[in-house]
Regions:
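Acyl-donor-binding surface of acyltransferase catalytic domains
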Residues: 3-14, 101-183
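A short, internal acetyl-CoA/4′-phosphopantetheine-binding micro-motif in the GNAT/acyltransferase core
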Residues: 98-108, 248-258
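Conserved active-site alpha-helix within GNAT-family acetyltransferase domains
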Residues: 137-152, 287-305
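Conserved catalytic-core motifs of GNAT/GCN5-like acyltransferases
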Residues: 151-162, 302-316
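Short amphipathic alpha-helix that is part of the acyltransferase structural core
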Residues: 2-55, 163-206
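Conserved beta-hairpin
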Residues: 45, 53-85, 215-232
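Conserved acetyl-CoA-binding loop-helix of GNAT-fold acetyltransferases
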Residues: 109-120, 252, 258-275, 293-298
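A conserved beta-strand-loop-helix scaffold within acyl/acetyltransferase catalytic domains
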Residues: 196-250, 254
Length: 316
């Protein structure tokens, strides 16, 4: 089977697994084309010797060879599955195996077979779990630990909702340069320090990354009565071939938390995005970031899928 043929089969299966409400946002032909492109590259990577050599050098594990860092296509219950080794935070001691693509439904038989194969094929890494994306939840009979929640909503539907009210009047001021980066970085560090459970899931962008976000034109300082209380920023990012946006940064400083500002701030950003270019506002939020998930739901960005870790060696 050629890479293109396998990628097409994976793409059609992935499209079929999408929830109906998500499919309604999308042009099916465009989505299928985008999935084919991404999956053709993923399928070809399993023969990319240069990539696996770089991967090995970046995450060295005693006793491992370059081939151990290679993705593999396997057959489980008559279905093709593409598995790939990963390391959380590029830490060689935190290995997991990613289900990159598969044919057919996301059912217990497929995941059990993948878990058995992953444990054997990559035993040198001692992987902790198999990771997969499900729409919207894991099949019954499989033990799963939550990771990231996939949240999304269209700007059109969000802007048609009644806007959430803020307890205090807020103003959003467009950012045009990086002069406020240090203030933002300090506030972000205070947030990280105050939420140790999220420490491994949060990354403060450097100034160069911040500058690139600002260039897209939708970065805003948030002020209350002239006092800076936070920042919110979005960048354009297609959603399965549809026009879309990702909220790249969203932060309220300590003094502004608990003041019912988060949802109005996010709604204000989305109204500006909609006026610029209607589309899907999407992204991922860690399941422990309860406040951010609540804000997303208040605005109209619902959980449509989940990244799950399926523990290896469990009774699942």
């Amino acid at each position: 089977m050629t890479d293109a043929h396998l990628a097409d089969r994976f793409a059609r299966a992935a499209l079929a697994r999408l929830p109906a409400e998500v499919s309604d946002w999308l042009d099916q032909d465009v989505v299928l084309d985008e999935l084919r492109k991404a999956l053709t590259a993923a399928v070809a990577k399993r023969r990319d010797d240069a990539f696996v050599a770089r991967f090995h050098a970046r995450c060295p594990v005693a006793g491992a060879s370059d081939d151990d860092y290679r993705s593999v296509e396997v057959t489980i219950d008559g279905r093709a599955v593409l598995l790939e080794p990963r390391f959380k935070g590029l830490d060689p001691g935190k290995s997991f195996i990613e289900v990159v693509a598969h044919e057919g439904p996301a059912d217990a038989a497929l995941f059990r077979g993948a878990m058995d194969l992953a444990s054997e094929r990559w035993s040198v890494f001692k992987p902790r779990a198999l990771r997969t994306v499900v729409w919207p939840s894991a099949p019954e009979g499989i033990a799963a630990n939550p990771d990231l929640e996939v949240v999304a909503g269209t700007t059109t539907a969000i802007c048609e909702r009644v806007a959430p009210e803020a307890a205090r009047n807020l103003e959003m001021v467009r950012i045009t340069d990086t002069s406020g980066f240090e203030r933002f970085a300090r506030a972000y560090q205070r947030f990280v320090d105050g939420h140790p459970v999220l420490r491994d899931e949060l990354w403060i962008p450097d100034e160069a990354t911040f500058a690139k976000v600002v260039e897209h034109g939708h970065s805003y300082d948030v002020e209350v009565e002239g006092t800076w209380v936070g920042l919110i920023a979005a960048v354009p990012a297609p959603f399965m071939g549809a026009r879309g946006w990702i909220i790249h940064e969203e932060l309220l400083d300590e003094s502004a938390r608990g003041c019912r500002l988060a949802a109005p701030m996010q709604r204000g950003l989305i109204e500006r995005l909609h006026a610029d270019r209607a589309g899907v506002v999407h992204g991922t939020i860690h399941h422990l970031n309860v406040a951010s998930l609540a804000t997303a739901r208040r605005v109209g960005r619902d959980v449509i899928g989940r990244h799950l870790f399926l523990p290896l060696g469990s009774d699942a």
